[in-house]
């Protein structure tokens, strides 16, 4: 919890210069580097990563 207060972001993305406080944030960020779009609209052809 203290990392939030002191501004430390020790977790780094291996693909870019993104840093964060915890691994769950990195897991979410890593979707931005993926070419997969797993969430699709049932009514149209729209798809998203998130």
Swiss-Prot record:
The keyword Calcium does not apply. It comes from the Eukaryota. The gene is hb. Keywords: Developmental protein, DNA-binding, Gap protein, Metal-binding, Nucleus, Repeat, Zinc, Zinc-finger. Gap class segmentation protein that controls development of head structures. GO terms for molecular function: DNA binding; zinc ion binding. GO terms for cellular component: nucleus. The keyword Hydrolase does not apply. Belongs to the hunchback C2H2-type zinc-finger protein family. A zinc finger (C2H2-type) spans 1-5, 11-33, 39-50. This is Protein hunchback. One of its GO terms (biological process) is segmentation. Pfam families: zf-C2H2. The lineage of its organism: Eukaryota, Metazoa, Ecdysozoa, Arthropoda, Hexapoda. It is found in: Nucleus. Its main location: nucleus. InterPro entries: Znf_C2H2_sf, Znf_C2H2_type.
């Amino acid at each position: 919890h203290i990392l939030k207060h002191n501004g430390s972001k020790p977790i780094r993305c291996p693909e870019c210069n993104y840093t964060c406080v915890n691994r769950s944030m990195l897991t979410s960020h890593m979707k931005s580097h993926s070419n997969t779009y797993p969430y699709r609209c049932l009514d149209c052809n729209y798809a998203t990563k998130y």
